[in-house]
Amino acid sequence: MKNELCLPAVFDEKVKAYAQIFTKFNKVHSLSNYKDISEQVLDSIKPLEIFDLSAKTAIDVGSGAGFPAIFLALAMPQTKWHLFEPIAKKSSFLSYAKIELGLQNLEVHSQKIELADKFTADLITSRALSKTKELIKICEGFYDENTKFLIYKGSSVMEEISGIDAQIYNEKNRNYIYFNLKNQGEIR
């Protein structure tokens, strides 16, 4: 289940640049309560060691300050990332970070995913947005039976994913939930 993590040569440099941008914006706009983003960066990219996340097109729902999407986009430059964030100060920050980090594989959508034009993604990620089944519902039109979902969840997740055949990897207080909807039947 472990994959060797092979990050692009510029990854650490870009993370440092992101940290500076984040610190500057966070003082004014209160994007997040994180003071040190090191653990959040590691949490964001940990699934790359665990699951096969290869994708041509990926969506992150409720991107907030960019965890995990910015770091997955840095680590997966071959993937086109679509970040959906309806809160203006956060989507503005994400757009600024995209430009400053030179992330040409990333597009910021300043809207709720439910209101966006539909397209099919290979991978859909989300962290701390909503219950898993609610996330599946709001993403209708963006997935097919082959689309993989990667959901970052806290420690109590089993009831939330009942009825979903998923791989679950636990580390500390984090559960990484990975699944697709092939042969799942209707999820309620």
Swiss-Prot record:
It is found in: Cytoplasm. The keyword Ion transport does not apply. InterPro entries: rRNA_ssu_MeTfrase_G, SAM-dependent_MTases_sf. Its EC number is 2.1.1.170. One of its GO terms (molecular function) is rRNA (guanine-N7-)-methyltransferase activity. Keywords: Cytoplasm, Methyltransferase, rRNA processing, S-adenosyl-L-methionine, Transferase. It holds the Pfam family GidB. The keyword Repressor does not apply. It catalyses: guanosine(527) in 16S rRNA + S-adenosyl-L-methionine = N(7)-methylguanosine(527) in 16S rRNA + S-adenosyl-L-homocysteine. S-adenosyl-L-methionine binds at residues 62, 67, 113-114, 127. GO terms for cellular component: cytosol. Belongs to the methyltransferase superfamily. RNA methyltransferase RsmG family. PANTHER family: S-ADENOSYL-L-METHIONINE-DEPENDENT METHYLTRANSFERASES SUPERFAMILY PROTEIN. Specifically methylates the N7 position of guanine in position 527 of 16S rRNA. This is Ribosomal RNA small subunit methyltransferase G. It comes from Campylobacter concisus (strain 13826).
